[in-house]
Amino acid sequence: MELDEVIITRAIFEEYSKTFLEYTDIDVALVGGGPANLVAAKYLAEAGAKVAIYEQKLSLGGGMWAGGMMFPRIVVQEEACRVLDDFGIRYKEYEPGYFVANSVESVGKLIAGATSAGAEVFNLVSFEDIMIRENDRVTGIVINWGPVTTQRLHVDPLMIRTKLVIDGTGHDAVVCNTILRKIPNAKIGEFGILGEKPMWSEVGERLAVDATQEIYPGLIVAGMAANAATRAPRMGPVFGGMLLSGEKAAKLALDRLKKI
């Protein structure tokens, strides 16, 4: 058949616009497209929640793509292998309790798992602010195009209403820090956002799961953002804690949605 460039343009514009409008009112907005939020998105979508991931960059996956220092391999502990199994990610045992997976395959299958389950992805869309209502509860997010943010252009944003937000923005804990900056006397965590501690893989991995919580009304924190929000150590290219944090975040969100 003969291709018509205008039909191609219309197809892309109309279909994306329909999806964008459909997702202006959702159950859970996952800010950041790293491994923790990809895991959470899959489990939430499978449970029937209407969820969307908002990622400022072109690609999802956070820091998982490059493995350790651009060696495309990651390490996962035995207790997190069930999450790898859920996504069909292959791995092998290196030493007892240490399992190695290909980082590129891992990211690809995490993305495929989340989207196949029904999670919608808005890449090149940046988080700019939160929406609040009574008692300063988080009720939505304010978004803009990623290049608008990176180029510091003066362009007003648009808004998304959501029952819950999951901050999966990694080391910067962007959503948490926005709340601290904009809501006087807001209490997040025991000491506020002090940033993560230096490397300690064992403790950082354990606390990544322990720190995954509804840290502020309407806001759940997951992955490396959970460590940054609770003054826990970083852990490097071992990703079991990230995967289990995403699993826990989904469970917390589903329980919370039942009460809203």
Swiss-Prot record:
Top-level class of the enzyme under EC nomenclature: transferase
CC cofactor: Fe(2+)
GO annotation (BP), single: thiamine diphosphate biosynthetic process
SUPFAM superfamilies referenced in this protein's UniProt entry, alphabetically: FAD/NAD(P)-binding domain
Keywords from the UniProt entry: Iron, Metal-binding, NAD, Thiamine biosynthesis, Transferase
A Pfam family hit: Thi4
Gene Ontology molecular function terms on file: iron ion binding; pentosyltransferase activity
Ligand binding (NAD(+)): A36, E55, Q56, G63, H154, V155, D156, M224
Annotated EC: 2.4.2.59
Subunit text: Homooctamer; tetramer of dimers.
Function: Involved in the biosynthesis of the thiazole moiety of thiamine. Catalyzes the conversion of NAD and glycine to adenosine diphosphate 5-(2-hydroxyethyl)-4-methylthiazole-2-carboxylate (ADT), an adenylated thiazole intermediate, using free sulfide as a source of sulfur.
NCBIfam families with a match to the protein in the record: sulfide-dependent adenosine diphosphate thiazole synthase
Listed PANTHER family: THIAMINE THIAZOLE SYNTHASE
Name of protein: Thiamine thiazole synthase
Species of origin: Methanosarcina mazei (strain ATCC BAA-159 / DSM 3647 / Goe1 / Go1 / JCM 11833 / OCM 88) (Methanosarcina frisia)
